[in-house]
């Protein structure tokens, strides 16, 4: 028989740097999950992605066990890394803060494909291009 799901928690954490401090402690503590076990397992799984923010969906069961799925980093994080900028533009249509090439856009779309609701690379590129436009990043 399958275990009963008590809660599903979604949080974004820096890869390889989860600690029992907030936000992990405050998200998992009320459900009685072993926070150190989660942190250790998350850090092992995401060590190769150091420096990126990783969204994680944690499923908590009635026996206080858990399972989790890591997603791909948000498109905005990947775009900022590719453009070499700290943050997006406060006025995206007026003030451009960075540039990326079509090739970089394609690479980001390929990384994000498994989390996007499309199987077409061109459609994924258009979605990522929209995010870039709203951040003030120009595609050349």
UniProtKB/Swiss-Prot annotation:
<dbReference type="GO" id="GO:0003735">
    <property type="term" value="F:structural constituent of ribosome"/>
</dbReference>
<keyword id="KW-0687">Ribonucleoprotein</keyword>
<keyword id="KW-0488">Methylation</keyword>
<dbReference type="InterPro" id="IPR036769">
    <property type="entry name" value="Ribosomal_uL11_C_sf"/>
</dbReference>
<comment type="similarity">
    <text>Belongs to the universal ribosomal protein uL11 family.</text>
</comment>
<dbReference type="InterPro" id="IPR036796">
    <property type="entry name" value="Ribosomal_uL11_N_sf"/>
</dbReference>
<comment type="subunit">
    <text>Part of the ribosomal stalk of the 50S ribosomal subunit. Interacts with L10 and the large rRNA to form the base of the stalk. L10 forms an elongated spine to which L12 dimers bind in a sequential fashion forming a multimeric L10(L12)X complex.</text>
</comment>
<dbReference type="InterPro" id="IPR020783">
    <property type="entry name" value="Ribosomal_uL11_C"/>
</dbReference>
<dbReference type="Pfam" id="PF00298">
    <property type="entry name" value="Ribosomal_L11"/>
</dbReference>
<keyword id="KW-0694">RNA-binding</keyword>
<dbReference type="GO" id="GO:0070180">
    <property type="term" value="F:large ribosomal subunit rRNA binding"/>
</dbReference>
<dbReference type="InterPro" id="IPR000911">
    <property type="entry name" value="Ribosomal_uL11"/>
</dbReference>
<dbReference type="GO" id="GO:0006412">
    <property type="term" value="P:translation"/>
</dbReference>
<keyword id="KW-0699">rRNA-binding</keyword>
<dbReference type="Pfam" id="PF03946">
    <property type="entry name" value="Ribosomal_L11_N"/>
</dbReference>
<comment type="function">
    <text>Forms part of the ribosomal stalk which helps the ribosome interact with GTP-bound translation factors.</text>
</comment>
<dbReference type="GO" id="GO:0022625">
    <property type="term" value="C:cytosolic large ribosomal subunit"/>
</dbReference>
<keyword id="KW-0689">Ribosomal protein</keyword>
<dbReference type="InterPro" id="IPR006519">
    <property type="entry name" value="Ribosomal_uL11_bac-typ"/>
</dbReference>
<dbReference type="InterPro" id="IPR020784">
    <property type="entry name" value="Ribosomal_uL11_N"/>
</dbReference>
<protein>
    <recommendedName>
        <fullName>Large ribosomal subunit protein uL11</fullName>
    </recommendedName>
</protein>
């Amino acid at each position: 028989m399958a275990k009963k799901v008590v809660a599903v928690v979604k949080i974004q954490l820096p890869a390889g740097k989860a600690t029992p401090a907030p936000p992990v402690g405050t998200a998992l503590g009320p459900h009685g999950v072993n926070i150190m076990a989660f942190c250790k397992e998350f850090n092992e799984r995401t060590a190769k992605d150091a420096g990126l923010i990783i969204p994680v969906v944690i499923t908590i069961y009635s026996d206080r066990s858990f399972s989790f799925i890591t997603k791909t980093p948000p498109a905005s994080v990947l775009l900022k890394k590719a453009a070499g900028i700290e943050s997006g533009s406060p006025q995206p249509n007026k003030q451009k803060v960075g540039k990326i090439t079509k090739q970089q856009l394609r690479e980001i779309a390929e990384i994000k494909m498994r989390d996007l609701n499309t199987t077409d690379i061109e459609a994924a590129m258009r979605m990522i291009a929209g995010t870039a436009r709203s951040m003030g990043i120009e595609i050349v």
